[in-house]
A protein has these predicted regions:
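Generic hydrophobic, aliphatic-rich segments that mediate packing or membrane embedding
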Residues: 65, 69, 85, 96-99, ...
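Glycine- and acidic-residue-rich phosphate-binding/metal-coordinating active-site segment common to enzymes
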Residues: 107-189
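Short cysteine-rich loop/turn motifs with clustered Cys
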Residues: 88-110, 134
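N-terminal accessory alpha/beta regions
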Residues: 2-83
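Short secondary-structure junctions and interdomain/linker hinges
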Residues: 27, 80, 96, 160-161, ...
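Long alpha-helical scaffolds
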Residues: 39-43, 108, 226-230, 234
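C-terminal, charged low-complexity interaction regions
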Residues: 1-26, 193-298
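Short Cys/His-rich Zn2+-coordinating modules
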Residues: 76-90, 112-119
Length: 298
C-alpha cells in the first residue's frame, strides 16, 4: 500500500475533444459530438473530483450531462489502449510503476477506475481516476465498493507503520498473520479504507502465499550469519535486509515488515530458522570463509 505520483491533467480537454465525435456506420450516425459548453461541464466534474480527493459524490455522475454524452465518454475508454487515440493516458499511468500500489506483490497490468466507470461515466477517461493495479487486485474490486479503497493519488499515506505481522514457528513451518494496526497514527477515514482493502483484497492470504518462497532466497545468508556470529548475526542480517527493502519499496511493504518481525522473534533468530529453512551447505560455506580469512590474516 503506497502512494503514486498524481498524473498531469494538462491534456484533459484535448483528450475529450479527441475521443468524442460522430461517425457513420452502416449508414447510421453514431458517437457524440459535444459542444464547447459540454466539454467545460465535464472539466468542471474533473475539478470537483480533484477538490473532493476522488471521494464519491452524486455530482461526479454527471446528472447535468446528457445521457448520450455520459455514454460516449464511457465507451471512449478503449481509446486509452495502445492503438487508441489517447494511449498516453495509459503509458503515463504505468510509467515507473513496477509494483501494484495496493498489494506490492505483482506488477501492475491493468488500469483500475477508482470510481467505477459503470457508475461515474464522466470519469471514464480521466487520468486521475485511472490507477495501475495488478490483475488480482483489480479483479477483486467491485463497482459497488467505489470510494471504499485508499486512493493511490489522493489519500496521502503518512510515514507511519500501519502494516504489521505476527510470526510463529509451528510444526517446523513459519506461520504469519498480517493485519492493519488499529492504533496506527492514521486519520480514521484513511485507516478504515486501508482495513477494508486488506480484507476485500485478501491481502493476508496473498502475502502468506509468497512468504515461504521469498524466505527461501535468504536461507544461505541466514545460516552463514548465524554460523559466524550466532543469533546476533541472524538479527543483523534480517534488520539490514529489511532496511534495504524498506528503502527500495516502502516501510509498509509486506517484505520488510516480515523481516523486521523475524528479527524481533528470538525463537527464529536463535536457531528456529534452521528448522524452517534447513540448509546443510551453509555451515560448510561459513567454515570455508572463516578458514580463508584465517589464512589471509596469517
Amino acid at each position: 500500500m503506497r502512494n503514486l505520483p498524481k498524473p498531469s491533467r494538462d491534456t484533459a480537454k484535448a483528450d475529450l475533444e479527441e475521443v468524442l465525435y460522430t461517425y457513420t456506420y452502416k449508414n447510421e450516425q453514431r458517437g457524440y459530438a459535444p459542444t464547447d459548453a459540454e466539454i467545460l461541464d465535464v472539466l468542471a466534474i474533473y475539478d470537483l473530483y480533484d477538490q473532493t480527493l476522488g471521494a464519491p459524490a452524486a455530482a461526479l455522475k454527471g446528472p447535468n450531462l446528457t445521457e448520450g454524452l455520459r455514454g460516449a465518454i464511457r465507451h471512449a475508454y478503449p481509446q486509452t489502449y495502445e492503438n487508441g487515440k489517447i494511449p498516453h493516458i495509459r503509458e503515463t499511468a504505468f510509467e515507473k510503476v513496477d509494483m501494484c500500489p495496493m498489494c506490492g506483490i505483482d506488477p501492475p497490468v491493468e488500469l483500475d477506475h477508482h470510481l467505477a466507470k459503470s457508475i461515474y461515466e464522466p470519469l471514464s477517461v480521466y487520468s486521475r481516476n485511472l490507477v495501475p493495479l495488478c490483475e488480482a487486485c483489480n479483479g477483486a474490486k467491485l463497482a459497488s465498493d467505489s470510494g471504499k479503497y485508499a486512493h493511490a493519488y489522493f489519500d496521502e499515506l503518512p510515514d507511519v507503520q500501519f502494516l504489521r505481522v505476527e510470526v510463529d514457528i509451528h510444526d517446523g513451518g513459519l506461520v504469519t498473520t498480517y493485519e492493519i494496526d488499529d492504533a496506527a497514527a492514521l486519520p480514521p477515514p484513511l485507516l478504515a479504507k486501508i482495513k477494508f482493502q486488506m480484507e476485500a483484497l485478501s491481502l493476508n492470504a496473498r502475502f502468506k502465499k509468497d512468504v515461504n518462497s521469498y524466505m527461501v532466497a535468504h536461507t544461505t545468508g541466514l545460516h552463514m550469519a548465524a554460523d559466524m556470529m550466532g543469533g546476533g548475526g541472524t538479527r543483523y542480517y534480517l534488520r539490514k535486509q529489511a532496511d534495504i527493502e524498506a528503502a527500495k519499496f516502502y516501510r509498509n511493504h509486506w517484505r520488510p515488515v516480515l523481516l523486521y518481525a523475524l528479527a524481533a522473534h528470538d525463537g527464529f533468530c536463535d536457531g528456529g530458522f534452521r528448522t524452517v529453512l534447513p540448509d546443510v551447505q551453509a555451515a560448510r560455506q561459513a567454515e570455508d570463509l572463516i578458514a580463508k580469512e584465517a589464512v589471509e590474516a596469517a
